[in-house]
A protein has these predicted regions:
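Conserved catalytic core of the tyrosine transesterase superfamily
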Residues: 1-233
Length: 233
């Protein structure tokens, strides 16, 4: 709606400049206010239990399963975009201030950021890389139907396909980008500062981060749950 209003405002100004409508009419049109977007929810996200279910749906007895487990873990625990997961190299994984991080990741708009990574995610990465016997280059590689390495990297679409496979398996309707939203939402509900979430996601504006979060609305603790009305069955 706001985009359409903006186009109408521009059209009114051009019409006034070309003498097609009165200047006062154009001025009135330009003063029409747009709709505020506070609280808008973009996409979907998982609860903590759903996130755990998704990661645990992988098969730890296969090379592909270990890889996919690490992919899901890193996306949910760091908020990396699927393209960033595909681009992730061993050089990115470093220790800073006594903890594991994904260092100097170049993201959207060529913005460089460092993202803290929990130890349990590092464990899943180690399990994958040690089983695959890889120590440098891209962290995530293609695995063929014989459960053997078949390439030295993965595409962004391949990362999306991994997420879809386990989302369908777990009965969850979501995309790879929804795991990024899940990271933001779970971190916020756990008490993380919005600014720190913004920095880790690489958002230029806090407004974008707040839209990920749905502002401060908590659908699991809704006002309607406190009304107390019980109807006869």
């Amino acid at each position: 709606i706001n985009q359409k209003l903006s186009a109408i405002r521009r059209l009114a100004v051009e019409a006034s400049d070309n003498g097609l409508i009165d200047g006062q009419i154009a001025s009135g049109i330009s003063r029409v206010k747009g709709i505020k977007k506070a609280g808008v929810r973009i996409g979907n996200w998982l609860t903590k239990d759903q996130a755990e279910k998704l990661i645990n749906s992988t098969d730890k007895t296969t090379l592909k399963g270990l890889r996919d487990r690490a992919i899901l873990a890193i996306m949910i625990s760091t908020g990396l975009r699927r393209s960033e997961v595909a681009d992730l190299t061993f050089d990115h994984i470093q220790q800073r201030d006594g903890r594991w991080v994904i260092a100097d990741m170049i993201g959207k708009g060529n913005r460089v950021r460092t993202i803290p990574m929990p130890s349990w995610t590092k464990v899943t990465i180690d399990q994958w890389t040690q089983s695959a016997n890889i120590t440098d280059g891209h962290v995530f590689r293609s695995v063929n139907r014989h459960d053997s390495l078949s390439g030295d990297s993965m595409t962004s679409q391949a990362i999306q396909d991994v997420v879809k496979l386990y989302a369908d398996k777990s009965g969850l309707g979501l995309s790879a980008h929804d795991l990024r939203r899940t990271y933001a939402k779970l971190a916020y509900r756990g008490g993380s500062d919005v600014l720190q979430i913004q920095l880790s996601l690489g958002h230029e504006s806090s407004d974008t981060t707040k839209r990920y979060l749905g502002e401060v609305q908590d659908l699991t603790n809704a006002p309607c749950d406190f009304i107390g009305i019980r109807l006869d069955e």
